[in-house]
Design a protein with these regions (language model features):
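Short, Lys/Arg-enriched N-terminal segments with co-localized hydrophobic residues
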Residues: 1-5
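Alpha-helix capping and helix-coil boundary motifs
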Residues: 6-7, 92
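Negatively charged, low-complexity tracts enriched in Asp/Glu with abundant Ser/Thr
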Residues: 9-60
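Amphipathic protein-protein interaction modules
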Residues: 58-115
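Charged/polar positions within long, soluble alpha-helices
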Residues: 113-116, 120-123
Length: 124
């Protein structure tokens, strides 16, 4: 499932920048963690918490996990898996995300606030 990074404005056929920004992600397939360079100024402790959260999710559930800011600055958990991945736990995925949201509520709320402050400044 390849996601579109750019959206097309139907009236003028101009290419617009994406309205969503990936904060970080991890993959059980290549066993890697990624954090968006736009967030390199986050404290190391927060980056480490994100890494642990994403990597452990992929180790437990499988597939790919991304934390994505939507156009309003809300942080969403997105999962995906290869079509032939029989080990991916689809039901466990939803339960694990709910658990992570509850356990890391303060961290996630702080990241949303950080995003809104930083990216509102960039748009001015």
């Amino acid at each position: 499932n390849r996601k579109r990074n750019m959206s097309e404005n139907k009236k003028t056929n101009q290419i617009q920048p994406p309205e969503e920004i990936v904060l970080c992600g991890a993959s059980a397939y290549n066993q890697k963690f990624y954090i968006n360079e736009n967030f390199k100024n986050l404290p190391d402790e927060i980056k480490n918490q994100l890494k642990v959260m994403c990597v452990l999710f992929c180790a437990d559930i499988g597939g790919i996990l991304q934390l994505v800011f939507d156009e309003e600055g809300n942080l969403e958990f997105r999962t995906a898996c290869n079509e032939d991945d029989l080990l991916y736990d689809d039901i466990g995925s939803g339960l694990k995300i709910k658990e992570l949201r509850q356990k890391n509520e303060d961290l996630l709320r702080g990241l949303e606030l950080y995003y809104k402050v930083i990216f509102d400044k960039l748009e001015e």
